[in-house]
Amino acid sequence: MRLIPLKDTAQVGKWAARHIVQRINAFKPTAERPFVLGLPTGGTPLEAYKHLIAMHKAGEVSFKHVVTFNMDEYVGLPQEHPESYHTFMYRNFFDHVDIPSENINLLNGNAPDVDAECRQYEAKIKSYGKINLFMGGVGIDGHIAFNEPASSLASRTRIKTLTEDTRIANSRFFGGDVSLVPKFALTVGVGTLLDAEEVMILVTGHAKAQALEAAVEGNINHMWTISCLQLHAKAVVVCDEPSTMELKVKTVKYFRELEAESVKSL
């Protein structure tokens, strides 16, 4: 595992965006051989999306031959709802870059048969071989995507019941009213994430410190699904200073020395 300890949220977003651009450009994608990118929603990746848009506008990257798969979507929330993840992605990223609409894959939380929707999503991912890079965030309780505590580490895309803690955390997007937050979501599984060639998780804020500790220094444990990163051959965790507060000083020092070159010019 790589741990990239940075100063603040702005640096986390910049490092993540720069890493994605480097990966896309090194891959040299074409229409026949696109780069497959997994994407999250929520507050954490917003800085990364801002930097990706800026780098695209500066001519440093094109998304013309990039195919995206999003992590999750609420069940029962209309697609046009301001807090649907469909709306979020277009508002904060897709509308500002040159990605063709046919290359965008989002789970349909209003599908008449959600189980079939999840199976088709998995099949479409497999049709591209694999996801080259999956970017994600983490919840206070250590969940990645909507793989809540006690999710199977072999799980695939499916419907999940959201915990009360997750709904309370997400109520900030619904005017603070928990009753407006959907109780169910479709989400890629832990196994789906582990199948990606590379997984990059962004961790920001002191509230995520316990989750980061579980990911880096804890045991592999389905109660902290982020700990599954320890099983991945190419996992990258990009974090800000407040989120490292539960890590041992020597752990942060070790990774800071290892990654000194990669964080230059941020």
From Swiss-Prot:
Reported EC number(s) for this entry are 3.5.99.6
Q: Which InterPro entries match?
A: Glc/Gal-6P_isomerase, Glucosamine6P_isomerase, Glucosamine6P_isomerase_CS, NagB/RpiA_transferase-like
**So, what pathway does this thing act in?**
Amino-sugar metabolism; N-acetylneuraminate degradation; D-fructose 6-phosphate from N-acetylneuraminate: step 5/5
Residue intervals passing through the bilayer = none
* Role played: Catalyzes the reversible isomerization-deamination of glucosamine 6-phosphate (GlcN6P) to form fructose 6-phosphate (Fru6P) and ammonium ion.
Catalyses: alpha-D-glucosamine 6-phosphate + H2O = beta-D-fructose 6-phosphate + NH4(+)
Q: What are the protein's UniProt keywords?
A: Allosteric enzyme, Carbohydrate metabolism, Hydrolase
The scientific name of the source species is Serratia proteamaculans (strain 568)
Against SUPFAM superfamilies, the record matches this protein to: NagB/RpiA/CoA transferase-like
The entry assigns this protein to a family as follows:
Belongs to the glucosamine/galactosamine-6-phosphate isomerase family. NagB subfamily.
Matching CDD domains, A to Z?
GlcN6P_deaminase
According to UniProt, residues marked as the site described as Part of the allosteric site are: S151, R158, K160, T161, Y254
UniProt subunit comment: Homohexamer.
Output the Gene Ontology terms for molecular function.
Answer: glucosamine-6-phosphate deaminase activity; identical protein binding
Q: Where is the active site?
A: D72 (proton acceptor), D141 (for ring-opening step), H143 (proton acceptor), E148 (for ring-opening step)
Q: How is its activity regulated?
A: Allosterically activated by N-acetylglucosamine 6-phosphate (GlcNAc6P).
Single Gene Ontology BP annotation: glucosamine catabolic process
Judged by the first EC level, this protein's enzyme class is hydrolase
Specify the superkingdom.
Bacteria
GO CC annotation terms, alphabetical? cytoplasm
Instruction: Report the protein name in the record.
Output: Glucosamine-6-phosphate deaminase
